[in-house]
């Protein structure tokens, strides 16, 4: 991104801080997009975050986090649907933004395969909708599931049956066949739907993608049936027999079975033909009648696809070549400051409504105070140093979804007297000092739990699906209960039944509640007094501690008593507890500091202790012993691995009973060093620890 310091100029400490920030931002974007069908940043901004994260990981492989966004697919599941575990994972795609990146992808494929001849590819439009997997047994549709987090989706079978161009029976199909594709809504149908919504006085949808996703995920199939959804098939999952030998032949087979496939799919050789097809599809984009945001390229030979395989979250044999963002000019009417769960002050532009790429937008992200001032977080100019002022005419862009980004300012149209924007140095919600920590690009409220905005956002996080997931207590209910003074901290939720059971009428008389729903809520709260350790750690809402990190911490410490005692004794920067914390692969100094600091802040600790008094915390699951050459050994991976991703290597080692550490110590048994290993390899040599390369590791575990 243009407002960021070049990766090759970052110090190791700056890179670690940046990776932590990116992990937090990408996780929030994933949840908004995949779980709530309500994106908070544009596709272009999201792609840029992922791209920068990948670039930093490549420059500093030893800093790669265990919860790296590079390994994540989709988001958490929504409430109300049964879970479906995908027999074959539904992965996301790597992105390319120009010809050079497409050529690099092709070259990586050639190197991986040792292939010097011509390669054939398919090119097809990337539909902007909701991914769906359809399972057919003996030719009958038996299950439909959303992508979810890639491993587990939502069962939307009855809703999917209402989609007109989705066959419920197949003639001549394999006994088992999972067909995958995209549910979408045409522009014409979207306009008609919003017209009906407006006439009925109901909420309008922001864009066709949100309308399609919201329609498919209705709890009442009759509502879905009333919505004009469509489906394009483009892939497959589990199958009892091959569909064909090539990608384009397999798509033709799906069409013969009765599925709608995209007519713009073409067979291409080399980057020049791919780029020509990309340009042709983009030329036709406005006339297609449905939203697309790029072109997907796939290796055509399915045998080669199988050889290429997958990284942690993307196939090696496919890539999405995205379109450039869409632009428009409008006037900035105001700047609001929102305060998030971790105290971040986020500026939001309030715009005179403008149509960008067919969608009316009125808000835009302004990132942080430096972005408004026309510089990046290191003081270097962006936009030629032009600052952003209320009243300015600004250029905004979007590339598929809601809140866009302010890209430029027209100084010639700046109103006389427009004043420089002064970013608040106190929290607009609680008045506490808002400070910027070294290396942080945002200003944060220091009020902690006395800040009402942080209170309510933390409570929302606490009841989220990956945390306590209390049925009947979602974000809206939490906000209402907080607003009326019923809850202020997580412990208050568990006091609700005792405090209000006698006066249950108080709750049932609230808007949206009845006696049954109130009784169900109290029962759900009681059920959550027993909680898994990793869920509790995640629910605390400590900065930088995501789901994956919470699981790592739970696995490492085993019990709440051990975890709580270690955090109590730990001191930032020194001591055995600190070193033990840093030994966890994926836990760096930034995350560890955040964790230890939280347990040493008086208000934070009081809230944690009050909560723990209500709970029975289940110990982390202990894996059964595994017989392998590395079982029980502590392994450190450093440098670049060429035959598998770091995440794949870590998963394989742990499956064989090894413990993967993020740092080298006297307790380390084996260091696996790839190119660019750096200080960890030197430290291992100094300690006399066995060091092997990737091939040696594969021989050791029997995968050579």
UniProtKB/Swiss-Prot annotation:
Active-site residues, as the UniProt record annotates them: 126 (n6-amp-lysine intermediate)
Annotated SUPFAM superfamilies: BRCT domain, DNA ligase/mRNA capping enzyme, catalytic domain, Nucleic acid-binding proteins, RuvA domain 2-like
GO BP terms: DNA repair; DNA replication
Domain BRCT positions: 625-704
EC nos: 6.5.1.2
CDD domains per the UniProt record, alphabetical: BRCT_DNA_ligase_like (cd17748), LIGANc (cd00114)
MF terms (GO), sorted A to Z: DNA ligase (NAD+) activity; metal ion binding
Cofactor(s) annotated in UniProt: Mg(2+); Mn(2+)
Family matches, as Gene3D superfamilies: 5' to 3' exonuclease, C-terminal subdomain (1.10.150.20), 6.20.10.30, BRCT domain (3.40.50.10190), DNA ligase/mRNA capping enzyme (3.30.470.30), Helix hairpin bin (1.10.287.610), Nucleic acid-binding proteins (2.40.50.140)
InterPro entries for this protein: BRCT_dom, BRCT_dom_sf, DisA/LigA_HHH, DNA_ligase, DNA_ligase_AS, DNA_ligase_CS, DNAligase_adenylation, DNAligase_N
Chain residues that bind NAD(+): 43-47, 92-93, 124, 147, 182, 298, 322
Reactions catalysed according to its record: NAD(+) + (deoxyribonucleotide)n-3'-hydroxyl + 5'-phospho-(deoxyribonucleotide)m = (deoxyribonucleotide)n+m + AMP + beta-nicotinamide D-nucleotide
UniProt function note: DNA ligase that catalyzes the formation of phosphodiester linkages between 5'-phosphoryl and 3'-hydroxyl groups in double-stranded DNA using NAD as a coenzyme and as the energy source for the reaction. It is essential for DNA replication and repair of damaged DNA.
HAMAP family cross-referenced by the UniProt entry: DNA_ligase_A
Family statement drawn from the similarity comment of this UniProt entry: Belongs to the NAD-dependent DNA ligase family. LigA subfamily.
Protein's name according to its UniProt entry: DNA ligase
Lineage: Bacteria, Pseudomonadati, Pseudomonadota, Alphaproteobacteria, Rhodobacterales
Gene that this sequence comes from: ligA
């Amino acid at each position: 991104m243009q407002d960021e310091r070049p990766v090759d100029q970052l110090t190791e400490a700056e890179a670690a801080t940046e990776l932590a920030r990116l992990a937090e931002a990408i996780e929030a974007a994933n949840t908004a997009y995949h779980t709530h069908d309500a994106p908070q940043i544009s596709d272009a901004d999201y792609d840029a975050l992922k791209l920068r994260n990948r670039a930093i990981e490549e420059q500093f492989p030893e800093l790669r986090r265990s919860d790296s966004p590079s390994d994540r697919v989709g988001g958490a599941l929504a409430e109300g649907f049964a879970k479906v575990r995908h027999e074959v994972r539904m992965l996301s795609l790597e992105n390319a933004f120009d010809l050079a990146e497409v050529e690099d992808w092709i070259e990586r494929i050639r190197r991986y395969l040792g292939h010097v001849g011509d390669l054939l590819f398919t090119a097809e439009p990337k539909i902007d909708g909701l991914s769906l997997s359809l399972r057919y047994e003996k030719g009958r549709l038996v299950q439909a599931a959303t992508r979810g987090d890639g491993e587990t989706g939502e069962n939307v079978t009855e809703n999917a049956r209402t989609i007109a161009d989705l066959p419920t029976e197949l003639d001549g199909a394999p006994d088992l066949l999972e067909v995958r594709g995209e549910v979408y809504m045409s522009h014409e149908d979207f306009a008609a739907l919003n017209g009906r919504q407006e006439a009925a006085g109901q909420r309008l949808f922001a864009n066709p993608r949100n309308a399609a996703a919201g329609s498919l995920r209705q709890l009442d199939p009759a509502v879905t049936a009333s919505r004009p959804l469509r489906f394009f098939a483009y892939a497959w999952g589990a199958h009892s027999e091959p569909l064909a030998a090539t990608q384009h032949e397999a798509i033709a087979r799906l069409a013969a079975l009765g599925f709608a496939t995209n007519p713009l799919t073409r067979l291409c050789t080399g980057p020049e033909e791919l780029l020509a097809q990309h340009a042709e599809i983009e030329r036709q984009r406005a006339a297609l009648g449905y939203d697309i945001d790029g072109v997907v390229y796939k290796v055509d030979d399915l045998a080669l696809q199988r050889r290429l395989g997958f990284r942690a979250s993307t196939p090696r044999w496919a890539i999405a070549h995205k379109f450039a963002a869409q632009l428009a000019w409008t006037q900035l009417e105001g700047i609001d400051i929102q305060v998030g769960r971790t105290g971040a002050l986020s500026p939001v532009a309030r715009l005179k409504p403008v149509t960008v790429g067919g969608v009316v937008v009125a808000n835009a992200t302004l990132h942080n105070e430096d972005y408004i001032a026309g510089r990046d977080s290191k003081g270097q100019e962006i936009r030629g140093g032009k600052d952003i002022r209320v009243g300015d005419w600004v250029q905004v862009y979007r590339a598929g979804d809601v809140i866009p980004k302010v890209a430029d300012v027209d100084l010639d149209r700046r109103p006389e007297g427009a004043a420089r924007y002064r970013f608040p140095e106190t929290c607009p919600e609680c008045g506490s000092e808002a400070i910027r920590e070294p290396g942080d690009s945002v200003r944060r409220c220091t009020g902690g739990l006395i800040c009402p905005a942080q209170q309510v956002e933390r409570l929302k996080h606490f009841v989220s699906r990956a945390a306590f997931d209390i049925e009947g207590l979602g974000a809206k209910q939490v906000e209402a209960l907080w607003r009326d003074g019923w809850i202020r901290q997580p412990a208050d939720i568990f006091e609700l039944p005792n405090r209000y059971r006698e006066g249950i009428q108080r709750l049932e008389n609230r808007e949206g509640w009845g006696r049954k729903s109130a009784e169900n809520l109290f029962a759900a709260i009681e059920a959550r007094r027993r909680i898994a350790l990793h869920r509790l750690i995640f629910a605390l809402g400590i900065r930088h501690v995501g789901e994956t990190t919470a699981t790592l911490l739970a696995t490492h410490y085993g019990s709440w008593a051990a975890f709580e005692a270690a955090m109590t004794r730990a001191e930032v920067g020194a001591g055995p507890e600190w070193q033990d914390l840093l030994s966890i692969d994926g836990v760096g100094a930034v995350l560890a500091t955040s964790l230890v600091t939280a347990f040493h802040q008086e208000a934070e600790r009081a809230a944690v202790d009050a909560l723990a008094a209500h709970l029975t915390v289940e110990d982390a699951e202990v894996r059964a012993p595994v017989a392998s050459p590395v079982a029980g050994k502590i392994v450190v991976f450093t440098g670049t691995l060429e035959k598998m991703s770091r995440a794949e290597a870590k998963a394989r080692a742990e499956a064989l009973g090894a413990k993967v550490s993020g740092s080298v110590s006297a307790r380390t048994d084996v260091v696996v060093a790839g190119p660019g290993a750096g200080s960890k390899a030197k430290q291992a040599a100094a300690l006399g620890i066995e060091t092997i390369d990737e091939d040696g590791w594969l021989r050791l575990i029997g995968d050579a």
